[in-house]
């Protein structure tokens, strides 16, 4: 039924929250701001790292030191983005099986494109060919705009009709809608199932290998 899968990264393929939270907490401590818990940080993930930092400090982007704070946060995260990050249980088995079935795959994330490429090379080298991160400076709007998904489909030589989008959040559901793709939401990510059930989706899956039943 589908020959292409577009994956979100954080909360879908990789459990990155501990490393993201550590970088947020580093910046908060360095500048004397209240320090958020991991669960508090988790609620703010999904719209890219800049918006995450906006939500994590007093005054957000209106803070006169915001650019410096964001630069320090980004540098710290880039250096420590793989300390505790890991693929969710069953993800590598799923990706390998999809590869075996000649399913085309891409990662589309609002995370900085350098971090996305780095994590793709560490965890999915030789398995996933296309990985796109936030690059609005190049005129490509971040999710939930359809731009990144359309770019990924173009690179893969795929069509919307034969492609499915897999993610774990409100942003992912809306991205799929905007891109004209069916959406599969995963319950092991950064949003609880009761939140996911209020969104637009084709199916919610609880284990990675359940995706195989959907794409057949």
Which residues are covered by each model-predicted region?
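Phosphate- and divalent-cation-binding pockets in alpha/beta enzyme and binding domains
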Residues: 23, 52, 90, 115-118, ...
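Short secondary-structure boundary segments
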Residues: 110, 135, 187-189, 208
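Short acidic-hydrophobic, aromatic-tinged amphipathic segments that line or gate anion-handling sites
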Residues: 203-207
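Substrate-recognition "cap/lid" segment bordering the active-site pocket of phosphatases
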Residues: 83-84, 113-164, 170-179, 193
């Amino acid at each position: 039924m589908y020959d292409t899968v577009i994956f979100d990264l954080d909360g879908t393929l990789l459990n990155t929250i501990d490393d993201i939270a550590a970088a947020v907490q580093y910046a908060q401590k360095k500048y004397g701001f209240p320090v958020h818990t991991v669960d508090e940080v988790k609620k703010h993930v999904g719209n890219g790292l800049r918006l995450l930092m906006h939500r994590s400090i007093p005054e957000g982007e209106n803070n006169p030191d915001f650019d410096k704070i964001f630069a320090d946060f980004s540098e710290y995260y880039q250096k420590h983005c793989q300390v505790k990050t890991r693929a969710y249980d069953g993800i590598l088995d799923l990706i390998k099986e999809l590869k075996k079935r000649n399913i085309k795959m891409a990662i589309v994330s609002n995370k900085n494109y350098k971090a996305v490429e780095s994590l793709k090379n560490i965890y999915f080298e030789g398995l996933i060919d296309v990985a796109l991160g936030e690059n609005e400076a190049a005129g490509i709007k971040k999710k939930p705009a359809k731009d990144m998904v359309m770019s990924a489909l173009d690179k893969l030589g795929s069509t919307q009709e034969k492609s499915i989008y897999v993610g774990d959040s409100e942003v992912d559901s809306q991205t799929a809608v905007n891109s004209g793709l069916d959406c599969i939401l995963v319950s092991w990510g950064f949003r609880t199932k009761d939140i996911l059930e209020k969104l637009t989706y084709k199916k919610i899956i609880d284990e990675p290998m359940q995706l195989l039943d959907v794409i057949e």
